[in-house]
A protein has these predicted regions:
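N-terminal ligand-binding/catalytic initiation module
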Residues: 1-112
Length: 112
């Protein structure tokens, strides 16, 4: 699993990861209220820029949603880029799980 940190202003941590057919992103907008919580979107985007733009918008939105709900969680989001053709979903999502685990509990996800 190859992980690359991305420097994005006003976000605590943004990174991408790749392994075989897996490509994904995680954005942590804020952990001020607790670990960042947000779903994982499995989607085909036009390009990486579009995926990152959506990722950042959704992570920021989760910060506000969780704060307004009064729950002790910050905001984050992840995206798994859906590859073309036949795919091994289990292999792809296991790679994503390994990526999420590198955040040491600072990001908690579920399906989008």
């Amino acid at each position: 699993l190859t992980i690359t940190d991305l420097q994005i202003p006003n976000y605590e941590h943004v990174a991408s990861a790749e392994e075989d057919d897996y490509r994904g992103f995680v954005a942590i907008h804020s952990t001020k209220l607790g670990p960042a919580v947000g779903g994982t979107r499995f989607w085909k985007y036009e390009n990486d820029e579009a995926a990152i733009r959506d990722l950042l918008r959704l992570a920021r939105g989760m910060t506000y949603k969780n704060a307004l709900a009064g729950i002790p969680f910050g905001g984050g989001k992840s995206i798994v880029l859906r590859p073309d053709g036949d795919i091994d979903r289990e292999k792809i999502f296991r790679a994503h799980g390994r990526f999420v685990n590198t955040f040491g509990g600072q990001y908690i996800t579920a399906e989008d």
